[in-house]
């Protein structure tokens, strides 16, 4: 009889631990630490089911509660808005100075902003795409207008995998606007 009680107790504790819920929270910021609003965050489970959504306000803060512990999740980040936001001829000048070797772009994030065709390098093609957007010849860049990064990771993504075994705070994302090399985009648009 004590063996059965012990077995039942172990099963109850295992189910109780699995039923534990946690919170994922953090900030969506520019590379200059300004909050970014209107970012849609979706938490997706392994079956591609959206289990939670959150849209940031202008502070960029987010908190997503009641996520089951021990589950593999993916956080998807998207931001809509005008492709023209933050794109100007000054961005073309700064990018051309970089290409000519006159003045290097100051960070991996500005390098990513200048790589509007997402080829992995900055070229004249990026400048042509910037020019076409500024002159309204094109109405968007290839892919998404906003790129997302985890701090310290220079590779952009829109999906970030995680497993919750406790509340996860400071799950921060850095975002930049494509083509906005000088950081002038309205991050709350």
Feature map (PLM): residue ranges:
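Bacterial Sec-dependent N-terminal signal peptides
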Residues: 1-23
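Cellulosome-associated attachment modules in secreted, modular CAZymes
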Residues: 20-189
């Amino acid at each position: 009889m004590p063996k059965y009680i012990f077995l039942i107790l172990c099963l109850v504790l295992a189910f109780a631990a699995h039923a534990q819920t946690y919170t994922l929270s953090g900030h969506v910021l520019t590379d200059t630490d300004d909050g970014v609003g209107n970012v849609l965050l979706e938490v997706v489970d392994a079956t591609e089911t959206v289990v939670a959504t959150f849209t940031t306000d202008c502070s960029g803060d987010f908190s997503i509660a009641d996520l089951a512990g021990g589950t593999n999740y993916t956080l998807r980040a998207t931001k809509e808005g005008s492709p023209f936001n933050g794109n100007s001829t000054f961005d073309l000048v700064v990018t051309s100075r970089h290409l000519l070797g006159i003045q290097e772009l100051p960070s991996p994030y500005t390098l990513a902003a200048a790589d509007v065709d997402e080829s992995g390098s900055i070229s004249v093609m990026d400048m042509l795409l910037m020019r076409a957007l500024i002159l309204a010849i094109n109405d968007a860049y290839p892919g998404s207008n906003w790129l997302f990064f985890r701090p310290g990771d220079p590779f952009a993504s829109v999906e970030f995998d995680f497993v919750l075994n406790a509340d996860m705070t400071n799950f921060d994302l850095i975002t930049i606007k494509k083509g906005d090399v000088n950081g002038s985009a309205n991050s709350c648009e």
